[in-house]
Structures are given as structure tokens and as C-alpha cells.
């Protein structure tokens, strides 16, 4: 049974390469490494070659690494729940990661408590329509005269952790960085209708542990913020506490206050925007270029901001030398 109030932590993985490959601080890698090292299996979301989000099962680090990073689209579960139950009944340790509604759905499907099941859910803003994502990709391909080869929903390497910039690489060797999909996503017009009534937009979540980017870290634990990524960890019950204790050896961590960690999705669902119907009318009847300009913030001003951010970050990398902490607890 989950506690009425979670225990809250700021977390960074000790291994800098792991943190660099993660979208925030690397907590998912630490948790999944614990399960894999004991012969367990991990279920999580990956991008296919067609840039669809799907849940897969893995017992190895290579496929697990594909699960790292943000995917701002809804994953297809397929027969994942059936597979999870099969593993549980075979006494395999299972880590399932997903949105809160996916975790709740899994628990309802399996129908009883399993000591060998560990669930991680994410602090979720909501999930957008697949139509928007596919239209965005087609628009970028038309602009670049090439098929998309890879997608980074949040390019931490070039723009840092604080900024949300998507980067697409193309088969012709070119790349482009943009905030169009980010602007559409955070404008909330593209979300599924059920997301506006989500019962999990609070501090109470169905997972054993809930994870997120630690937005607000400058208040909760400013010494953690080096713009390379910090994970927010909510430990929701005894099972979550047990595994978190086991992975602490892989982490630099600090217990923080819940009141300093309250992101909007931990308070209430986002309201349905007043312009949602107009957005969808525009999307169905206008070009995506029109939609991107009206709702996605494109233009010379935005392009200049992105270029300036990239230049500043490259300069900072040249003049700042980072140091390693000796302490695991801050």
C-alpha cells in the first residue's frame, strides 16, 4: 500500500556517462541495473525505426539503454501486460516503467500483489495525439528533403538540461534543432481528452517509485544543479524504499522537501485550453507550416534564440572545467 505522502529525493548517477545518456539524473538506469543484475527483466518504452513509441521487454543492458530518455508521445503496449504476468508467475523479477495510467492498468490486469513486481511511473504532463507527431515528422522531412534518421526529444548534449530542444538528424547527413513540438506539447492543445481529467496529477501515484526531471532543484538543492540533469525521486511505499536503498551506492543523493518539489503535474490536471477546438480545426484544414507558425513558435526570433543558446553552451564547455564529488550524500 502506498503512503499518503512520498519520501522525496534529488538524485544524480555517479557515472557521468550514464547521466549524460539519461534525460535527467540517471535514476532509471540505476533501478533497472539492480533488476537486471539479479536475473530480472525490464519493460519500458523505446522508439522504433519508424519513430513510433512501443513498450518492449528486455533482459539486457543494450535494449534497456534504448528505454532511456524522454519520449513525448504515447507508447503502444501491445501484449505487454500478458508478458509481464507470465514473467511474474515464472518467479522472474520484473521492473515495469511507464506513465501512471499504464502502471495502474497493469496492476488492475494482474489482479493481485506480486513481491517480484516493481513499478516505476513518471511525472507526466499528458500524452499528445499520434497524428501531431507524424505530421511534425513529415513537415521536417519536407523541409530537409530527406527522411528522419534519428530523434532526440530533448538534446541535453548541445543545449543543456534546463532547455527543452528537440534535434532531428536526417539520412542526408543534415540535422535541425527545434522547439516546435515542445511548444505544441506544452501548449496542451494536443493532449488526449482523458489527460485533462487525469486522476494521477497529484503526489499520489500508483508506482512504487515515481521519477521525473527535478524542476525546482534550484530551490530544493541548488548544489545539485550543474545543468547536466537531476532526477526527482518520489518513494511511494516500502517496496520502493527497499529497492532505492539497494541502488543508493550507484547514486549521489539528497533527501529534499516535498513542498520544494511541487511541479504543476503533481498538483492538478492541466485545464483544457480555450483554443483547443480552434487548434484542431486549423490542424485538419491548414498546412502544418501554418500550425507551426501559429502554435509552435517558429520564426527568426526563435531560431536566433536557439543558435545563441548553442553558442553559449559551447563557450561554457571550453572555459569551465568540471570536478567530481567525493561524497555520495549531499
Model-derived segments and spans:
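Short active-site oxyanion
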Residues: 91-95
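Short, flexible loop segments at boundaries between secondary-structure elements
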Residues: 118-139
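Long, compositionally biased charged/polar accessory segments in the mid-to-C-terminal portions
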Residues: 38-41, 146-330
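Electropositive, gly/pro-rich neighborhoods at or near active sites that engage anionic ligands
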Residues: 1-27, 32-34, 311
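Non-heme iron-sulfur electron-transfer modules
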Residues: 1-16, 50-58, 64, 216, ...
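Short, surface-exposed basic-aromatic patches at helix termini and helix-loop junctions that form
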Residues: 107-118, 137-142
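Glycine-rich phosphate-binding "P-loop"
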Residues: 54-82
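Gly/Ser/Thr-rich loops at beta-strand to alpha-helix junctions
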Residues: 24-26, 49, 96-106, 126-128
